[in-house]
Amino acid sequence: MGIKIEKGVNKNNIELLCSWSNELGSVFQEQWMGTQVSYPLTYEKIEKLENKFSIFNEEEFIGMIQEVRIEEDNIHIGRFVLNPQKTGLGFGTEALKEFIDFIFKDKNIRSISLTVFDFNKNAKQLYDKLGFVVDEVIETPKLKYIMKKHR
């Protein structure tokens, strides 16, 4: 397994993301995109996202992750998705470890936060495993957690 994170997502890979997401439907899209991006996913909707990164295993594009916003000494990440055929194989763990290491290279960043829906059990398990802890619980409109990892 040779996971690499690279800034940006090219046109062909954006089209792959749309295909993976749209095939699995609106609930899947909400899991990884949140509620601010309407279904179905299109090239234009992903293209508009800033600070997005490609995830590769060796040379194969397998997913995307985003630095959503900077909040003083915290970076909020999200929109983390893998090719559905690559889940459950350790790629998500390795990709998130790489992204965490990349972010923490900036010594001014003290923490990383993310939001996860309660129904997205596999993602929450991954975040727990990598040291994220629940920082805030949001109960409406759908139960979700803001989780945070400190340096």
Name each region found by the language model.
Residues 2-3, 7-85, 102, 106, ...:
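Acetyl-CoA-dependent GNAT
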Residues 76, 81, 113-115, 146:
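Conserved beta-strand segments that form the floor/walls of ligand-binding pockets within enzyme
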Residues 80-91, 116-117:
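A short, internal acetyl-CoA/4′-phosphopantetheine-binding micro-motif in the GNAT/acyltransferase core
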Residues 93, 118-136:
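Conserved active-site alpha-helix within GNAT-family acetyltransferase domains
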Residues 105-115:
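Conserved GNAT acetyl-CoA-binding A-motif
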Residues 114-124, 140-144, 150:
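Conserved beta-strand-loop-alpha-helix junction that forms the acyl-donor binding cleft
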